[in-house]
Amino acid sequence: MKPFWSRVWQSAAVVVAALAGLMSMQAQAATPAEIRVDYAYYSPESLVIRHFGWLDDAFKADGTSIRWVLSLGSNRALEYLSSGAVDFGSAAGLASVLARANGNPIHTVYVFSRPEWTALVVRKDSPIRSLADLKGKKIAATRGTDPFLFTLRALHTVGLTRDDVEIVNLQHPDGRTALANGQVDAWAGLDPHMAAAQLDDGARLLYRNVAFNTYGFLNVRDAFASQYPQAVERVLKVYDRARQWIVAHPAETAQIIADESKVSLPVAKLQLQRNDFSDPVPGDTQRAALKAAAPVLTAEQLTKPGVDPAKIVDTLIDPSFARPIVAASH
């Protein structure tokens, strides 16, 4: 009998070991070894979280490290998401639609703000007084970003297209410099650089339209969300903590923005004033705004043939992660 029971106990031990290994694998799958997150001067939450180390604290017990990557614009954030350089990236709504329409496998899981972060900017002594005056002029804009798409939509309101102007593709801070130096006639600005141009350079906002500013989206790679859904939830909890902290501490937030972005405190305060943090769950409001904006992507032939950007909007926006987190915080 002893050999029989010995074999039974040996078999049981193998089963227990296998189950333990499976549970260990499941635990590992719930939390990756590293989470790569972008931070951007146009995303106050990312700056606050990085400043306080809240993501590092949230995942410390799991042994998960946080790697921060600077995004200078939506184009960079979306490139990093596409290449897998980051798992979470901060980008404008319409730029995110364009990226997904052209094959970038991302979902929008959180709205970090409703900003007025872009406008068309000219020098204080510029003779340009209207959008129509831009015909034949040089406009600095970062392709694949909200300011670039804002420019196209603005031109369409007066019957112009990008063929009627010369778009000079420069990253946002370089666009400000080019405007100040007279290398371009106008610039599709982005905060905090736009606020700095206003306050420090005396630049003038030629055309403003809050409705043409699309939302600040936190996007996640589809592969990451599928493999680590619990990690996505935990990251969003930290983002929502930062959002609430910003609302309660505007002065401290402005100082963090100023320090991180290397701008003056008045510039940071102006940037912050142009953000609404009240609606963090992506949903019908964002869908409607983006579907209204989507035709410019087709009209300017920015998407692949046969792709309907309006349909892409529905596949991009995923409120399932943020909704319970925000509801629980109220």
Protein language model features and the residues they cover:
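Pocket-lining segment of extracytoplasmic ligand-binding domains
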Residues: 94, 167-168, 173-260
